[in-house]
């Protein structure tokens, strides 16, 4: 198997269902920070821990960046774009990586310090200009 095929298979195994296929920021001329709300749903019968990473910590913030989703529960995540230098953001292919692993009773921070990722899904970021 090629590395690309393995990566695609790994992306398919993702337990959490999210509310969007991309993270869309509606940029304004006033350069105020923009937030997008995403929802993660756990359709399984076990508690799952998630971790969200972004391509640039300088222009994005994720709240909360890690946590737990109980069985059949939905959690909200807010992703912020600083909206300071729109040209730099648009010129790069930014994305958010959502990782998950099974919970084992530790806190989320302890769990992600050395846990093996069981699934990942990447959502691309897009920037729309509102005039």
UniProtKB/Swiss-Prot annotation:
Matching InterPro entries: Ig-like_fold (IPR013783), MSP_dom (IPR000535), PapD-like_sf (IPR008962)
Protein name: Uncharacterized protein ZC262.1
Range of residues in the leader sequence: none
PANTHER family: MAJOR SPERM PROTEIN (PTHR21513:SF2)
Domain MSP: 14-130
Highest taxon of source: Eukaryota
């Amino acid at each position: 198997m090629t590395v690309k095929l393995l990566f695609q298979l790994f992306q398919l195994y993702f337990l959490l269902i999210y509310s969007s296929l991309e993270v869309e920021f509606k940029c304004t001329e006033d350069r105020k920070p923009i937030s997008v709300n995403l929802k993660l749903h756990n359709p399984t019968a076990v508690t799952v821990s998630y971790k969200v990473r972004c391509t640039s910590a300088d222009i994005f913030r994720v709240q909360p960046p890690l946590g737990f989703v109980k069985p059949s529960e939905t959690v909200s995540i807010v992703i912020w774009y600083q909206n300071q230098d729109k040209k730099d953001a648009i010129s790069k292919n930014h994305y958010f990586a959502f990782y998950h692993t099974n919970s084992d009773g530790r806190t989320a921070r302890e769990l992600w310090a050395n846990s093996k990722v069981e699934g990942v899904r990447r959502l691309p970021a897009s920037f729309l200009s509102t005039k």
